[in-house]
Structure formats: C-alpha cells, structure tokens
A protein has these predicted regions:
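Beta-rich carbohydrate-recognition and catalytic domains
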Residues: 1-10, 19-67, 76-186, 190-196
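Charged, often glycine-rich, active-site loop that binds/positions anionic groups
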Residues: 71-72
C-alpha cells in the first residue's frame, strides 16, 4: 500500500507473488524517492491466511551506493524459495547497467541471502521461471536498451542451464518487420511441452 504518511513510500510497484510451504509471499519495489533512483529497495511481505492479512515489510535488499534493487519474481523449487529481482545503477543517469540478481530465503532466520548478479546485459525479470521439456528454465522479461545505444526496451528471455539458477543466458526478442523498436517489452511465455 502506498502510504507516505505512515511508511514514507513515494513509490511502490511490481508485485511478484508465490506460494511456498503454505505461505503466500509478495515482493515489490519500494522507494522513498522517485522511481528508478538509488534509494529503491526490494521489499517482501508474507501472508499466512491466503492474502487476507500480511506481516510487516521485510527488506530483501536495500542496495548500497548508487545501486537500486527493485521488483522481480519468485520461484519455489525443490524446497527453496528463490527471488530474481531487477536492479540498476543510478549515478550517471536515471538508471543504467540494468541486471537481475538472485536471492534465497533462509528459512531459519527468515532473511534473504544474496546470490549476486545472475543475468546482465539489461535484463529485467517479469515472469517467474517456467521449466521447459529439456530441463532448463525460461524466465521472461525485457531488456532495457538505453545502456546499449538502442531505442526501445525489447522483450527478452533468460534461460538457465538446468537447475543452476546462478547463471542465465539472455536472448533479446527482436520486433517483427514493420514494428517500431520504441516499445516497453514486458513479456511472458507459455511453455507447452517442447513449444514455448
């Protein structure tokens, strides 16, 4: 909830939801300043009653220096809750050096452990990873093109190597002939057998 009178938030956006061990997790970007500035933080709240009520906000990553960490997606797999969050640096311009970072929930402490940068090159995750028939996972998102001298922010996917969630290969999806490149390509994928 955007409540500058109580939590100081000037901006919240990008809810990611996941069920994990009977609890509902919600992540979102939170900023007391403007969107896409270094004060952006990744926050999480947890519900034990299916979303009727929520626990207090927990900071997954507040960044440091010019690093802002924002919204992303979850994956509950093999007993572990992963989070893949969009992040950026913001000292030279609004935001650049965009990338995705991974986090794992420590069930004992209920804190999030950073696993570092997992997809570089402007990739921002927008959909939870889906497992493909070859055993690899595909995560849909977009590639912020400004840092690469390109117009537009085209749809993109990141593909894992099996269950290794610490290294993803990013592929930008080019626009069809005749379609302008000036798009905001938030994307999603549907996996049906060997078809994506």
């Amino acid at each position: 909830k955007h409540r500058p009178d109580s939590d100081g938030a000037n901006w919240t956006l990008g809810v990611g939801l996941a069920w994990h061990k009977g609890r509902l997790y919600a992540s979102y970007g939170f900023n007391k300043g403007a969107e896409n500035t270094p004060t952006e933080e990744a926050h999480v709240r947890v519900s034990d009653d299916g979303g009727n009520s929520w626990g207090p906000p927990v900071v997954m990553d507040a960044g440091e220096g010019d690093l802002g960490v924002s919204h992303g997606v979850f994956l509950s797999h093999a007993g572990t809750l992963w989070a893949f969050m969009g992040a950026f640096h913001a000292h030279e311009k609004l935001y650049h050096r965009v990338h995705a970072r991974a986090y794992v929930l420590d069930e004992g402490s209920k804190k999030w452990a950073s696993r570092g940068v997992i997809a570089d090159g402007g990739f921002w995750p927008m959909q939870e990873p889906q497992q493909m028939s070859d055993g690899n996972w595909i995560m849909a998102g977009l590639r912020i093109g400004g840092g690469f001298g390109e117009a537009g922010n085209l749809p993109a996917v990141a593909i894992s190597k099996g269950d290794d969630f610490l290294s993803w290969e990013v592929t930008v999806i080019p626009p069809a002939a005749g379609v302008r490149r000036n798009v905001w390509g938030e994307s999603t994928v549907i996996v049906e057998g060997c078809r994506v």
